Amino acid sequence: DAHSHGDLILGSEDAHLFKTTQGVTTEIVGQCGLSMAPVMPENLAATQNMLSMGTTWFPEDMKNWRSFARYLEYADAQKLTANTKMYIGHSTLRIAVMGMENRPSTDKELDTMKGILREAMESGAAGFSTGLIYTPSCYAEEKEIIELAKVIAPFGGTYASHMRDEA
């Protein structure tokens, strides 16, 4: 499944069966700018609120996922029957650094996002996704997206975009 939101239910009872019982052996998660990590404690509620469009169940351990590496430790401990590749969601990344602010990122905020994204790629993330029609990704200027995409390039990462407008 090249466009999955299965990460939103990872760890829930029988989550591992949803895809494999349909013959899906690989799924790529973290789509549309939504990923389960990174999460900063001060922005946990905002992250969960944003993700609630896809789930209302959140693991207790989520409050500890300051880094993508911590999230991968959690994911690796779950019962997975499908191969899983994970993108870092731009909305999740943006909330971790600047909450739900309706404005462009500052240079300092962008540098922080780039650092977190670089660490995620070093930890095994497959790429980066945006949901440019959804908040808070829609508040980003083109420069921010380009700069973040540059971070994943040396890793051979994939950039998956949900466009700004569907009209």
Where do the PLM segments sit?
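Metallo-beta-lactamase
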Residues: 1-7
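Active-site core of metal-dependent hydrolases
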Residues: 125-167
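A short, structure-level motif marking secondary-structure boundaries and short turns
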Residues: 1, 57, 100-102, 133-134, ...
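A conditional alpha-helix N-cap/helix-loop micro-motif detector
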Residues: 9, 109-110, 141-142
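Divalent-metal coordination cores built from histidine and acidic residues
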Residues: 12-126
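A cross-domain feature marking catalytic cores of carbohydrate-active enzymes
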Residues: 4, 31, 86-88, 130-132, ...
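Flexible loop/turn segments at secondary-structure boundaries
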Residues: 7-8, 34-38, 92-95, 135-139, ...
